[in-house]
UniProtKB/Swiss-Prot annotation:
Main location: secreted
Enzyme Commission number(s): 3.2.1.8
Functional description taken from the UniProt entry: Endo-1,4-beta-xylanase involved in the hydrolysis of xylan, a major structural heterogeneous polysaccharide found in plant biomass representing the second most abundant polysaccharide in the biosphere, after cellulose.
Protein name as annotated: Endo-1,4-beta-xylanase 4
GO CC, alphabetical: extracellular region
Top-level division of the source organism's lineage: Eukaryota
Reactions accelerated catalytically: Endohydrolysis of (1->4)-beta-D-xylosidic linkages in xylans
A Pfam family hit: Glyco_hydro_11
All residue ranges annotated as the GH11 domain in the record: 19-210
GO biological process, one term: xylan catabolic process
Keyword Signal: yes
InterPro entries in the record: ConA-like_dom_sf, GH11/12, GH11_AS_1, GH11_dom, Glyco_hydro_11
Length: 211
């Protein structure tokens, strides 16, 4: 989730099967999905037609929650957003978040975060540059954990922005293409949202998705 002498490397390059080109799926619908996983742990409100949501939670959150707005079927389309996100002292993310059906994977493009960087404890895949910043890229395997199909074992992919921000355009295709070199299935998408996730601390977020 890893290179030999130069000559051996040349042989591997010469005889390895080509990496298939990723299939990039475009989004055809406006916002049509509300993500509300344990939103009752805080004050989650949203206006689907306006593309806005907010979440406030107090210190003492007892479990993980993920809330946001997006699309029932994900895509490689760019996502433009603006947010007011106060993450200090919380374990939380502001991220593009979604799932792939086969092979099952959970993914995050983390634009800002609180006191925990998920790549600090995962397997590094290197770095990539997108939208004015370097992103750390990493992967992890979750075993017998909650998923879109109940309890299952699946792969997680993370791109974590080094120059964090709370507004801008996320060129999703760059991240999908990078992950596809490491096993990410780039076509059979489940839902995709601009999300806030947290599991400790106190924080507030107000997010607008414009595309």
């Amino acid at each position: 989730m890893k290179v030999t002498a130069a000559f051996a490397g040349l042989l591997v390059t010469a005889f390895a099967p080509p990496v298939p080109e990723p299939v990039l799926v475009s989004r055809s619908a406006g916002i049509n999905y509300v993500q509300n996983y344990n939103g009752n742990l805080g004050d989650f409100t949203y206006d689907e037609s306006a593309g806005t949501f907010s979440m406030y939670w107090e210190d003492g959150v007892s479990s993980d929650f993920v809330v946001g707005l997006g699309w029932t079927t994900g895509s490689s389309n760019a996502i433009t957003y603006s947010a007011e996100y106060s993450a200090s002292g919380s374990s939380s993310y502001l991220a593009v978040y979604g799932w792939v059906n086969l092979s099952q994977a959970e993914y995050y493009i983390v634009e800002d975060y609180g006191d925990y960087n998920p790549c600090s404890s995962a397997t590094s895949l290197g770095t990539e540059y997108s939208d004015g910043s370097t992103y750390q890229v990493c992967t992890d395997t979750r075993t017998n954990e909650p998923s879109i199909t109940g309890t299952s074992t699946f792969t997680q992919y993370f791109s974590v922005r080094e120059s964090t921000r709370t507004s801008g355009t996320v060129t999703v295709a760059i991240h999908f293409n990078f992950w596809a070199q490491h096993g990410f299935g780039n076509s059979d998408f489940n839902y995709q949202v601009m999300a806030v996730e947290a599991w400790s601390g106190a924080c507030s977020a107000s997010v607008t998705i414009s595309s």
